[in-house]
């Protein structure tokens, strides 16, 4: 099977896939922020949440429903900052996935990734990582929303966790973006083989 990638390019393709997968898994999982409410663990992502309070009519009290899900609508996301974070991080993950899948195809298809295409792919990865990094930086701005304050002991604010903790998915998303920006972008410059020029 012919490949359009150098040895460095094959490593770049695998690392691109790993960094994209890491960022995408972290983005999708609702474990960016951990807290508790009514004695039950609660976690948030950018567009998903685990455990939420509902009013139990039979007992006339608030109870926690312990399940994960998306917000009912885009407007249901607790803060404008988290809505922007969802869009920006989602775009970044999409770009990283696009480049990763193209790079993996370059392992099997000859003359798909030239040096120029590799450099352009590296630029796209840098942009994707930058967008995800911007999303991660925006996320703490939403910690002053009412839903988060209920979970974090009513003492959280922008860039102030209160009684909450940052979850593994936040770190996972950021680590994937950092790997894409720092390692993959650099390796992409050396990923493609020099194009052969045919005399005809």
Curated annotation (Swiss-Prot):
One GO CC annotation: membrane
Cellular localisation: Membrane
Main location (coarse class): membrane
Signal sequence interval, chain numbering: 1-23
Keywords assigned: Membrane, Signal, Transmembrane, Transmembrane helix
InterPro entries on file: LHFPL
Domain of life: Eukaryota
Topological type in the membrane: Multi-pass membrane protein
Bilayer-crossing regions: 84-104, 123-143, 166-186
Family named by the database record: Belongs to the LHFP family.
Name of the molecule in the record: LHFPL tetraspan subfamily member 6 protein
Naturally occurring in which organism (per UniProt): Mus musculus
Gene that encodes it: Lhfpl6
């Amino acid at each position: 099977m012919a490949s359009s990638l150098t040895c460095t390019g094959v490593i770049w393709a695998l690392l691109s896939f790993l960094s994209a997968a890491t960022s995408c898994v972290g983005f999708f999982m609702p474990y960016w922020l951990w807290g508790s409410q009514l004695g039950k663990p609660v976690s948030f992502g950018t567009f998903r949440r685990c455990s939420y309070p509902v009013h139990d009519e039979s007992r006339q009290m608030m109870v926690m429903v312990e399940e994960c899900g998306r917000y009912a609508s885009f407007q249901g996301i607790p803060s404008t900052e988290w809505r922007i974070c969802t869009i920006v991080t989602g775009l970044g993950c999409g770009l990283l996935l696009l480049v990763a899948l193209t790079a993996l195809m370059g392992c099997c298809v000859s003359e798909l990734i030239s040096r120029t295409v590799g450099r352009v792919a590296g630029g796209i990865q840098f942009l994707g990582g930058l967008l995800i990094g911007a999303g991660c930086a925006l996320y703490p701005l939403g910690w002053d929303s009412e839903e988060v304050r209920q979970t974090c002991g009513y003492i959280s604010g922008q860039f102030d966790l209160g009684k909450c903790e940052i979850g593994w998915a936040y770190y996972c998303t950021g680590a994937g973006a950092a790997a894409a920006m720092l390692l993959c972008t650099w390796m992409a410059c050396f990923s493609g083989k020099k194009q052969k020029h045919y005399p005809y």
